[in-house]
Design a protein with these regions (language model features):
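Phosphate-end processing signature that detects enzymes handling 5′-triphosphorylated RNA
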Residues: 1-178
Length: 178
């Protein structure tokens, strides 16, 4: 049984952009129930994409069950086209390996489409109490806010959040607020 322990943060400023060129990720959900999600993903450059299917359980604190399997890219593309709920979640993911920041690897997601403007960093940890180095571009923790779950960004995209709230978050991301 696989267990994912993940913490999620807003990202401030733009220094993180230089860390990695990133890869395009397109993902959709076959199920987005609170107790379980089934996600299909295509990641990589066109023609060199990799497909995956992931089943996740309900989140408890910062952990949940997660089962992730590679599938043929053509199968993932067909599922995204024919079966996935709409809209798809699209983002550019940048990876910061543990060698560059002591502790654990970071993934920084810059959302596109209906979630454009939102930038979130995630770190997977070996246990819930694990310590880690907080890079200067790390903003407010949003691990316990379900609005930031990718599956929830499908039904409630960032672009549809109340304008005042969205603008406050965008100011945080730009580094204009604390």
């Amino acid at each position: 049984m696989a267990k994912e322990i993940e913490r999620k943060f807003l990202v401030r400023g733009c220094a993180w952009r230089a860390l990695d060129e990133g890869e395009l990720i397109r993902q959709g959900y076959l199920s987005d129930e609170k107790a379980r999600t089934v996600r299909v993903r295509l990641a990589g450059k066109p023609g060199k994409e990799k497909g995956s299917i992931t089943v996740k359980g309900i989140t408890s604190g910062v952990s949940r069950l997660e089962f992730d399997y590679e599938i043929p890219a053509a199968d993932a593309a067909a599922m995204l086209e024919r079966l996935a709920l709409r809209p798809l979640v699209e983002k550019i993911r940048r990876r910061v390996p543990a060698e560059r920041l002591p502790g654990a690897s970071w993934e920084i997601d810059e959302f596109l489409g209906e979630n454009a403007g939102l930038v979130v960093a995630e770190i997977e940890l070996p246990d819930e109490g694990a310590s880690f180095v907080r890079p200067g571009w790390l903003g407010r923790e949003v691990s316990d806010d379900p609005r930031y779950f990718n599956s929830n960004l499908l039904a409630h995209p960032f672009g549809a959040w109340p304008e005042a709230e969205r603008q406050a978050i965008l100011a945080e991301i730009r580094g204009e607020a604390d």
